[in-house]
C-alpha cells in the first residue's frame, strides 16, 4: 500500500478529528468543518458496525503516526509479544519511532516533515546519523540536528511552533542547541486521551 499523498484535511474530516497532519498548534481552523465528511456538502456518515468502529480507530491512529498497514500490523504483533497492556505497548512503540520523536521535540512542524528530515540524513542519534524513520529511540538517547541542517528555515519555524505546544514530560529539549534527550518511554497517561487503543486490540484479536 502506497503512502497517502493527497489533501491532509480530507483525512482528518474522514476520521472526524484533527490528526495534526498539517503544521500549526491547531492545524485545522474553525472555518473547516472537521466533523463533516469529505465532499462538497459532506456525505452523510453511515452508522458503523462494531467492526467499522474498530477499523476507523485503527485507521485514525495509523494516519496520525504516518505508518503503513503492514508496518502497523507488525507493531501490533510486537506489542502483543511484550509484557503488559498490548494497547499501551502499541502506542509506546509508535511514540518511540525516530520520526515521531523528532516531531515531539519540535524539530519538525509535522510528523511528515520530521520523517523527511530523517530520510534526508539531517538527524543524529547519540552523535551518529540515522536515516531510518522507524528507528526505535531508547531511554537516554540524545537526538540532535546535524550542523548543516540547523540553518534551515523550516527547522526554525518548527521550533517556534513547538514553543506554543504543550511540552512532553518524557523529553528534555535544548532548543538553542537543537538537541534533546528521550528521557523515558511515555506512560499511557502521558498520551492523547482521544485514542481508544482497546478498539484496535479488539480488531486484531478477532
Swiss-Prot record:
Primary gene name: rpsD
Ribonucleoprotein among keywords: yes
Source superkingdom: Bacteria
Cellular component, GO annotation: small ribosomal subunit
PROSITE patterns on file: RIBOSOMAL_S4 (PS00632), S4 (PS50889)
Subunit structure, as described in the record: Part of the 30S ribosomal subunit. Contacts protein S5. The interaction surface between S4 and S5 is involved in control of translational fidelity.
SUPFAM superfamilies linked to this entry: Alpha-L RNA-binding motif
Ranges for domain S4 RNA-binding: 96-156
Pfam families: Ribosomal_S4, S4
Family membership noted in the UniProt record: Belongs to the universal ribosomal protein uS4 family.
Disulphide bond pairs: none
Function: One of the primary rRNA binding proteins, it binds directly to 16S rRNA where it nucleates assembly of the body of the 30S subunit.
Protein name: Small ribosomal subunit protein uS4
Keyword tags: Ribonucleoprotein, Ribosomal protein, RNA-binding, rRNA-binding
Organism this protein belongs to: Pectobacterium atrosepticum (strain SCRI 1043 / ATCC BAA-672)
Example GO biological process: translation
Lineage of origin: Bacteria, Pseudomonadati, Pseudomonadota, Gammaproteobacteria, Enterobacterales
GO molecular function: rRNA binding; structural constituent of ribosome
InterPro entries in alphabetical order: Ribosomal_uS4 (IPR022801), Ribosomal_uS4_bac-type (IPR005709), Ribosomal_uS4_CS (IPR018079), Ribosomal_uS4_N (IPR001912), S4_RNA-bd (IPR002942), S4_RNA-bd_sf (IPR036986)
